[in-house]
Design a protein with these regions (language model features):
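Acidic (Asp/Glu-rich) sequence patches and key acidic residues
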Residues: 1-148, 152-156
Length: 156
C-alpha cells in the first residue's frame, strides 16, 4: 500500500482547513451568571492543541472534575467546564507539565490517518519550547481567573 505523508504546515491555508488540524479556546466565564458571558479568552493554536494531547497534559488535567456535555471530562471535539474551586490545582498541573517538558527535543508526531480513498498519514512537528511558552501563558490565565472568581470553559 502506498501511503502519502502530509506534514501539517500552519501557514498553508489548505492544511488549516483539514479537520485534523484542530484549535481550541479557553474562556473565562462565571457558571453562576444568569446568561452566558465570556469575560476573556485564550486561543489554543493547532500546534499547542496537538502538543497538549501528545505530552499527556490533557490526560493529567482529567484528574480534575471537568463537567462536559459528553461526560468525557476534558477531551477533543468537546466543551468542558471547570469550577473556580479547582483552578489552583489546574495551574499546578500546567506548571508541572511545563517543567517536565522543558528539556524535551522537538519531534514529529502522527496526528492521524485515513485509509480511503487514498492512504494518508498526517504528521505535525512539535516544538516543546513553544508548548512550554503556551503552558506558562495558560497557567497565568488560570491564576488570574482564580483570583477574579471566574470559572473556565475549554472548547476543544
Amino acid at each position: 500500500m502506498n501511503v502519502h505523508y502530509i506534514l501539517i504546515d500552519d501557514l498553508n491555508p489548505e492544511h488549516r482547513e483539514l479537520s485534523i488540524c484542530r484549535c481550541g479556546t479557553v474562556n473565562r466565564v462565571r457558571l453562576g451568571d444568569d446568561c452566558y458571558r465570556t469575560y476573556a479568552s485564550l486561543r489554543i493554536d493547532a500546534h499547542d492543541y496537538a502538543a497538549l494531547f501528545h505530552y499527556g497534559v490533557i490526560e493529567a488535567c482529567n484528574a480534575l472534575p471537568f463537567l462536559s456535555e459528553s461526560g468525557n471530562s476534558l477531551d477533543s471535539w468537546d466543551e468542558a467546564f471547570l469550577y473556580r474551586t479547582h483552578l489552583q490545582e489546574l495551574a499546578t498541573i500546567l506548571e508541572d507539565a511545563a517543567g517536565n517538558m522543558a528539556l524535551q527535543a522537538s519531534e514529529t508526531i502522527l496526528l492521524g490517518w485515513q485509509d480511503q480513498p487514498t492512504a494518508v498519514a498526517y504528521l505535525r512537528s512539535i516544538d516543546p519550547a513553544k508548548t512550554v511558552d503556551f503552558l506558562e501563558k495558560l497557567a497565568l490565565f488560570v491564576w488570574e481567573s482564580e483570583q477574579g472568581g471566574y470559572d473556565l470553559e475549554f472548547i476543544l
